[in-house]
Amino acid sequence: MHSTPGEQKLSGEVRHGDAFDLIGGLLDRSVDLILTSPPYWGLRTYGLDGTMEFAGSAVRGGGSAPEPPSYESYRDAGGILGLEPFPEWYISHLVEFFAGASRVLKRAGSLWINLGDTYFARWASIRDQGRQGYSEGRTRRRAPAGGYRHEKQLLLIPARFAIAMQDAGWILRNDLIWAKPAPLPRPESDRLKLSHEHWFHFVHRQPSARPKYYYDLSGSEEGGRDVIICAPTAGRAGHSAAFPPAVIRPRILSSSPPAGLVLDPFCGTGRALTESLELQRNALGFELSEVYAAVAESAVRASLADLAAKGHCSVGHSDVGCHQ
């Protein structure tokens, strides 16, 4: 399809597979914005089975976490991101991934990452298929205690991750708090409800100058404040971790130029991708779950078709940002 004057050609694509592998297929400095929410540690399976056997005696005996293995070694032993036996391993694997992703992010690009926290328990339930309710099936994970890993301890995973990213060379520009006005009911009666999550904004460190990156403050929330109050929205196909548009649209508008490329390497059912397309950005997503990848791909196709029907864009080729 040929573009008419004033019409934007947009591309959208979802690739099924492990983000650690798929990121290698992208061109250097091809992405304007990475906007994503990795699987939270130890909370949900999203239908993918992991194994705790890789931790060996450390899991059975407790104590200090052994040195984190590379993600490839962990995966080769059957491990899944988010189901590591130690939160330290999980944080290490996230930092490892984003170190690799830095190659594809433009020098003027931004990285926005959403993370929530959790409490430690040696035996804990993992919600199946990412659903939030209490009636769905669950699996059980075992995590060894030791150090700060103590029963009922709030783990501060977002803070530990942010500091690890700083240590890895990223510049942290914002810690945006997403406050949820009506959190889901919880059975605990000895603590307050977790009713907020973090959105971290990272940019490249420049070796000889202050960081220079694309940013349009007029695209952010009114007043440019670092707290947004917004209720979660229902996801597609039972996915509970979908982004509310009111939370992610300001990230897209402020941190990527029109016609830029937005990458969500853990795209779930594709909410960030369809919102990016609506805002006249190209969109690319990676998803490990075959079910969710299919849902996301369908949503992207529908969004592109709708935009084309309204005359807002023409559909481009789908090889966005990839090696030829």
Give the predicted meaning of each segment:
Residues M1-A209, Y214, S218-Q324:
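S-adenosyl-L-methionine-dependent nucleic acid methyltransferase catalytic domains
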